[in-house]
Amino acid sequence: MITDILPEVNKINDAGLRSKVIAVWEEAMAFRGWTPEILSSIPFTLLAENVRITFIEHVRTVCKMCIACDEVLTSAYRNRKTPIQRDYLIAGALLADVGKLFEYEIVDGKATKSDFGKKLRHPFSGVGLAFKHDLPPEVLHIIATHSKEGDAEKRSPESIIFHHVDFIDFEIVK
């Protein structure tokens, strides 16, 4: 089911890493009984009004943007490019917002911030769940530092890429 809603997971070459990413998504979806249909209809952010981009669209789009960014850098700089671990970049892109499945809940047919989400934002819950599933620290770092919580940290190259593409998608809709 996860590969149906997030086919980009198949771009992770490392089968073990891929299966861990899928396991994180499966557990997060089970927490509140999230379905692909619901995740494909709720807005990707609650920090702006009248958001027409859905949660799944956002996750997929920023993942594709990360891949495209890495491809452009590789094409331009070849062997002079700062090394990017593509599997970690993709895994981090797919998991950065998975904590929103804990942060959000549906009330009267509308996505709202849950009591849990009022206390812990998605980077924290996302890291916790990914840690539980033994994701490597490089991926945990992307999840942890992708949003404002990571501004005081030194971001890895993969986290820098994800942070910027995520904010491109966010800033143009808010």
Predicted regions and their residues:
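Divalent-cation-assisted or electrostatically stabilized phosphate/pyrophosphate-binding catalytic cores
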Residues: 110-132, 160
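Histidine/acidic-rich helix-loop-helix segments that form or flank divalent-metal centers
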Residues: 77-80, 89-90, 127-174
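Acidic/His-rich, divalent-metal-binding segments that scaffold phosphate/diphosphate chemistry
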Residues: 1-109
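Short, well-structured alpha-helical patches and their helix-loop capping segments
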Residues: 81-87, 118, 122, 135
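Generic detector of short, locally flexible boundary/turn motifs and exposed helical patches
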Residues: 27-28, 56, 125-129, 135
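Histidine-centered active-site/metal-ligand motif
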Residues: 58, 96, 122, 146-147
